[in-house]
């Protein structure tokens, strides 16, 4: 299995922890370092472009997008979250490999920390498990 991970640099303390969780979980389930391609993009809105480029230009079986958007005082949060969600849905509807949604959307930094290795676990771990399961699903159909 070959995995691609596209990570937003924005809120790097959160996205870094999510990335660490995802990579550790992939390795725990047998993925080799050389079969995990990690690329960064500046912000969460660029995640779908990065995933699309990875899909078109890499030999990958599944892609995980990792980002963190924390609500502020303007509608920017809503636009970014909706754009990324629609972008990932479009990639999954039209692409040949699964794109796993690892965008953390919270009201506060504390809520994000809770989901990035804090009291609610690490959503990066969950994304890695989902990627493995989706590769298994695709491979089971191609036998």
Curated annotation (Swiss-Prot):
5-amino-6-(D-ribitylamino)uracil binds at residues 10, 44-46, 68-70, 101. It is an enzyme of class 2 (transferase). It catalyses: (2S)-2-hydroxy-3-oxobutyl phosphate + 5-amino-6-(D-ribitylamino)uracil = 6,7-dimethyl-8-(1-D-ribityl)lumazine + phosphate + 2 H2O + H(+). Its EC number is 2.5.1.78. Gene3D superfamilies: Lumazine/riboflavin synthase. Coiled coil: none annotated. Pathway: Cofactor biosynthesis; riboflavin biosynthesis; riboflavin from 2-hydroxy-3-oxobutyl phosphate and 5-amino-6-(D-ribitylamino)uracil: step 1/2. Belongs to the DMRL synthase family. Catalyzes the formation of 6,7-dimethyl-8-ribityllumazine by condensation of 5-amino-6-(D-ribitylamino)uracil with 3,4-dihydroxy-2-butanone 4-phosphate. This is the penultimate step in the biosynthesis of riboflavin. This is 6,7-dimethyl-8-ribityllumazine synthase. It comes from Bacteroides fragilis (strain YCH46). The lineage of its organism: Bacteria, Pseudomonadati, Bacteroidota, Bacteroidia, Bacteroidales.
């Amino acid at each position: 299995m070959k995995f691609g991970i596209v990570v937003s640099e924005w809120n790097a303390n959160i996205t870094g922890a999510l990335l660490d969780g995802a990579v550790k979980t992939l390795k725990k389930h047998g993925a080799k370092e050389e079969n995990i391609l990690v690329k960064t993009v500046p912000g969460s809105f660029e995640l779908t472009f990065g995933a699309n480029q990875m899909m078109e230009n890499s030999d990958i079986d599944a892609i995980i997008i990792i980002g963190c958007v924390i609500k502020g005082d303007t509608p920017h949060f809503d636009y970014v979250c909706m754009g990324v969600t629609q972008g990932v849905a479009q990639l999954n509807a039209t692409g040949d490999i699964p794109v796993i949604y690892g965008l953390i959307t919270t009201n506060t930094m504390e809520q994000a920390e809770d989901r990035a290795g804090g009291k609610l676990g690490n959503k990066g771990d969950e994304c890695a498990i989902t990627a493995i399961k989706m590769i298994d699903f695709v491979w089971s159909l191609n036998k």
